[in-house]
């Protein structure tokens, strides 16, 4: 494994130096099974889980026996809210529940690094100095810059948390997902065709990831 070097693209179409993508983050083995498990857990955790149907004991009405037990020639009934009645309760219906799954942090990190490595190996990671120069947001400039970087449909833009200018510039662009470095996750990386990092966001992500790895080694 070796560190990958990328040019830092500027809004005027030039380059301003290079950055290194650490091999332990951007050149690891991508396990499809692991990424599948982590993405499934992430999507499950996003489910609201507030579905609910009423049982025969919760439906309004039906407290009185509809007709006497014997002598009518009809099948005996105890309530008009029994499940086989129209308007009756539901049997074995959905109830509120938590769909989240416990996923170890190591698995989450390994899946993310595998997804980023896959994008890096296919030259689908780009690094920019800033999305729009200056302090004035411009959706037009942001759109032109992103289209110059890639012609693929879905783009994941990773920017600094305080980069309000870039966020406002790209917020209305279709098929552009905006995250800060701390929000980067396996699902959004895999869903996107290309990942565009600002220099600030890339440095933040690398520092956090490598710092966490060093702390884990020290604990051992």
From Swiss-Prot:
Presence of keyword rRNA processing: no
Any Pfam family the entry gives: Ribosomal_L4
Entry GO MF terms: rRNA binding; structural constituent of ribosome
One GO BP annotation of this record: translation
A Gene Ontology term for the protein's cellular component: ribosome
Span list, region Disordered: 45-102
InterPro entries recorded: Ribosomal_uL4, Ribosomal_uL4-like, Ribosomal_uL4_dom_sf
Record flagged with keyword Transmembrane helix: no
Keywords from the UniProt entry: Ribonucleoprotein, Ribosomal protein, RNA-binding, rRNA-binding
Sequence similarity: Belongs to the universal ribosomal protein uL4 family.
Self-association and partners: Part of the 50S ribosomal subunit.
HAMAP family: Ribosomal_uL4_B
Role, per record: One of the primary rRNA binding proteins, this protein initially binds near the 5'-end of the 23S rRNA. It is important during the early stages of 50S assembly. It makes multiple contacts with different domains of the 23S rRNA in the assembled 50S subunit and ribosome. Forms part of the polypeptide exit tunnel.
Listed name of the protein: Large ribosomal subunit protein uL4
This protein's encoding gene: rplD
